[in-house]
């Protein structure tokens, strides 16, 4: 093409889907990726989790249950992860196990971009959104009216640790 025939795209990020390459499992690779939401050169990645916590297969496109949103450093399902943890908004905070807190979702209600992830958690009637920062992420959870809603924080695997310090709001 000549310079005159080249079309400039105004917002190229709109053409990116981080779901590409997520239809993989141990017997077949379609990329072995997960829908990472991260800043360039950020400290960590954030991703929805459809696999069992800590098993290496963080997200599989054909699994329609989200178990949490994980802070991860995982480069590949074959290498696994370290220092990871997950958070999950729930309508009933008494159900803390990963199976009890999981929620069905559909890809029609999922937006997966490098700078933004959003999904509607059908079982909890919660809309979850996240956007990365250099060292963490900002979340927005839209809950139905309820007195039992909450957020589960799960340091679920070896090498992970979380300490909540209420008096320091940290």
Model-derived features with residue positions:
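Accessory carbohydrate-recognition regions in carbohydrate-active enzymes
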Residues: 5-170
């Amino acid at each position: 093409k000549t310079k005159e025939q080249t079309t400039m795209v105004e917002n190229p990020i709109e053409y990116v889907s981080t779901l590409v390459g997520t239809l993989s499992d141990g017997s077949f690779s379609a990329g072995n990726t997960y829908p990472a939401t991260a800043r360039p050169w950020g400290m960590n990645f954030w991703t929805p989790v459809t696999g069992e916590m800590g098993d290496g297969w963080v997200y599989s496109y054909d699994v329609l249950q989200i178990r949490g949103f994980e802070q991860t450093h995982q480069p590949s399902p074959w290498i696994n992860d370290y220092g990871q943890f997950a958070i999950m908004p729930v309508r009933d905070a008494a159900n803390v196990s990963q199976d009890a807190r999981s929620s069905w979702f559909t890809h029609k209600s999922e937006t997966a971009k490098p700078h933004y992830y959003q999904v509607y958690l059908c079982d909890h009637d919660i809309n979850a959104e996240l956007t990365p920062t250099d060292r963490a992420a900002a979340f927005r959870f839209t809950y139905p009216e309820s007195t039992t809603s909450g957020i589960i924080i799960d340091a679920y695997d070896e090498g992970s640790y979380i300490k909540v310090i209420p008096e320091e709001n940290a």
